[in-house]
């Protein structure tokens, strides 16, 4: 499964791209670890044999994130808390929590992004992307 990892003051993809955020590291961690971001990476990454998804630096640089100015203070705090829990405990249900909060600021509903992500991931793993 795709995910970003938090290591002290930097965020790194599991293939070791280092991201130095200009915002709170846990908030950035939340923006990276949600179904909306995963969908973009599935769409833009290159597929290789056995369903391998190769991500390049420009795939990360071209990610579209929601405008954080549209989030209220409570939502930002919830994103940070869920992100901390994901980082500390590895509880992947926190990805759902993060995605649901972000869905409040997206034209794409939560259920639609989950369905679209599942479908594109399934096609990639079958070698049909």
Predicted regions and their residues:
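Polybasic, glycine- and aromatic-enriched phosphate-binding surface used to engage nucleic acids
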Residues: 1-81
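Non-catalytic DNA-recognition/assembly elements of restriction-modification systems
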Residues: 67-129
């Amino acid at each position: 499964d795709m995910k970003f990892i938090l290591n002290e003051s930097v965020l790194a993809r599991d293939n070791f791209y280092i991201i130095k955020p200009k915002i709170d590291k846990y908030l950035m961690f939340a923006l990276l670890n949600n179904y909306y971001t995963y969908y973009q990476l599935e769409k833009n990454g290159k597929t290789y044999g056995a369903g391998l998804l190769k991500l390049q630096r420009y795939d990360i640089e071209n990610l579209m994130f929601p405008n954080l100015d549209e989030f209220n203070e409570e939502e930002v705090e919830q994103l940070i808390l869920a992100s901390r829990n994901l980082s500390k405990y590895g509880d992947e249900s926190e990805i759902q929590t993060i995605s649901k909060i972000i869905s409040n600021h997206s034209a794409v509903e939560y259920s639609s992004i989950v369905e679209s992500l599942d479908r594109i991931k399934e096609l990639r793993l079958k070698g049909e992307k």
